[in-house]
Amino acid sequence: MPIPFYPHRSVLLEEVIEAFQPVQLKVFIDGTLGAGGHAEAILEHHPEIELYLGIDQDPNALNIANKRLEKWKQKILLKQGNFSQFDIFLKEIGFSSMDGLLVDLGVSSMQLDQPERGFSFSKDGPLDMRMNPEGKLTAADIVNTWSEHDLGKIFRDYGEEKKWRLAARTIVQARQVKQILTTTDLANLLKPAFAWNPKKGINPLTLIFQALRICVNRELDVLEQLVSKTFDYLKPGGRVAVISFHSLEDRIVKNELRLAASDKWETTGLGSGLFRDKKPVAKLVNRKPICPHEKEIKENPRSRSAKFRIAEKLEG
C-alpha cells in the first residue's frame, strides 16, 4: 500500500538548525519525529551524524518519515514509543549518551487534518485523540465515564478554561440522555454553553479539546520525565531543544531548564525559600523563548503559539 503524503510544515525549522549548528552531533535523538521535516534538515546539515534515533507514537508518521529519510537509511533508527523512553531505546542499542535531543510538542498537521484521529473539533470524527493508536484510553472514555469533578479538574488544570465547571456539568447532564462519541457531538454540545465571541480570544472549545488530548496522552507527565533526565544522558557541549505550544508545556520546560542551570537548589520543595548550593549542569542558550517570525506565522498559522527553549550541558 503506498504511503500517503501529508503536507506538514516543520515549525521554527531555521531556528532548530541554528540551535544545533555549533554541536558535533554523532548521536542525535528526535523525540517527536513526525513526518521527518526537522530530521531531514538536521541530517543535511550534520553529515557527521552516526546515529539518528527518531521516536514517535504514531506508526503512520514513522512510515512517512522512513520513506522521506531513505537517503540516510544507514544512519537512522526509528522507534515507536514516547519521547520519555529515549533512554530505554538508547540502552537497547548499546548507547549510553547523546549529543543532541529535539522535542517538538505540537500536534502535527497530518494528525489534526485526519478526522478519524479525533483531535480537531472542526472535523467530524470519533472522539479519540490517542497519539499512539494502540493506547487504551480515549477522549470518549473520559467524556462518558469520568465524574463531573474529575472532568472539571482536567478542564481547569490542562485547558485553563474559565468555565470549567459549566463544561463538566453540561457534559455529565447530556451523557445521561445519549453518549458523546464524536468530535461534532462534543462541539455542538458545548458551543451554546460557551457562547464564544471571536473578539474575546481563544475559542473555549480549543481549550477543552486541548485538555482532553493532554489527559489521554499524559503529555505533561511524560514531558516532566523527559526533561528531568535529559542531562544524565547528554554529553558535555551537547544541547537539548524543546518547542512547546501552550503555557503548561512551556512552564515545565522553563522551570526544568532553569533548575539545571541554577547554582541553587530548594531543599524542602518548591516555594520553601530554603536553598543550598549546587553545581549547575547546564547553561541556558536563550533566556527568553524564541518565537516564530511574522513571515512564518503568516505561512503557517499553527506556528503562532510556538516557544523554543535551548540548553547546553556543561563540562562535568
UniProtKB/Swiss-Prot annotation:
Similarity comment text for this entry: Belongs to the methyltransferase superfamily. RsmH family.
Q: Which Gene3D superfamilies match?
A: Putative methyltransferase TM0872, insert domain, Vaccinia Virus protein VP39
Q: What is this protein called?
A: Ribosomal RNA small subunit methyltransferase H
Q: EC number(s) on record? A: 2.1.1.199
Q: Where in the cell is it found?
A: Cytoplasm
Q: Which residues bind S-adenosyl-L-methionine?
A: G36, G37, H38, D56, F83, D104, Q111
Q: Please give the function described in this protein's UniProt entry.
A: Specifically methylates the N4 position of cytidine in position 1402 (C1402) of 16S rRNA.
- What gene name is given for the protein in this entry? rsmH
Return the SUPFAM superfamilies for the record.
Putative methyltransferase TM0872, insert domain, S-adenosyl-L-methionine-dependent methyltransferases
Q: Where is the signal peptide?
A: none
What's an example Gene Ontology biological process for this entry? rRNA base methylation
What organism is recorded for this protein? Answer: Protochlamydia amoebophila (strain UWE25)
GO terms under cellular component: cytoplasm
List the catalytic activities from the record. Answer: cytidine(1402) in 16S rRNA + S-adenosyl-L-methionine = N(4)-methylcytidine(1402) in 16S rRNA + S-adenosyl-L-homocysteine + H(+)
Q: Which EC main class describes this enzyme?
A: transferase
Positions in coiled-coil regions: none
- List the InterPro entries hit by this protein, alphabetically: RsmH (IPR002903), SAM-dep_MeTrfase_MraW_recog (IPR023397), SAM-dependent_MTases_sf (IPR029063)
GO MF entries? rRNA (cytosine-N4-)-methyltransferase activity
Q: Which domain of life, per UniProt?
A: Bacteria
Could you tell me which Pfam families the record lists for this protein? Methyltransf_5 (PF01795)
Alphabetized UniProt keyword annotations: Cytoplasm, Methyltransferase, rRNA processing, S-adenosyl-L-methionine, Transferase
